[in-house]
Amino acid sequence: MKFHIIFCLLAALMMTSAFAEVTVEPLRHSNKNPTESECKKACADAYAKGDQSKIPEAHNFRDYYCNCHVIVQ
């Protein structure tokens, strides 16, 4: 249910246009190429621990890092 709510928020945010890119801390995982779901979880965790005015919108992963696009309010 938690992921359903997150995906609903993501779908709504895709219609907005004011985005900035921020890099969250490296994924703590033995796999150097994390899966998309691991990346999404890392982004969601970063949001939960971080600034409540920034909501993860889209997720990409590269090497150990997960890059999140966040809406700037």
Curated annotation (Swiss-Prot):
Q: Where in the cell is it found?
A: Secreted
Tissue distribution is: Expressed by the venom gland.
PTM = Contains 2 disulfide bonds.
Q: Which GO cellular component does the record give, naming just one? A: extracellular region
Q: Tell me the leader sequence span.
A: 1-20
Q: Which domain of life is it from?
A: Eukaryota
Q: Major place of localization?
A: secreted
Function as written in the Swiss-Prot or TrEMBL entry:
Voltage-gated sodium channel inhibitor.
Query: Which family would the database say this protein is a member of?
Result: Belongs to the scoloptoxin-15 family.
Per its record, how is this protein called by name?
Answer: Mu-scoloptoxin(15)-Ssd1a
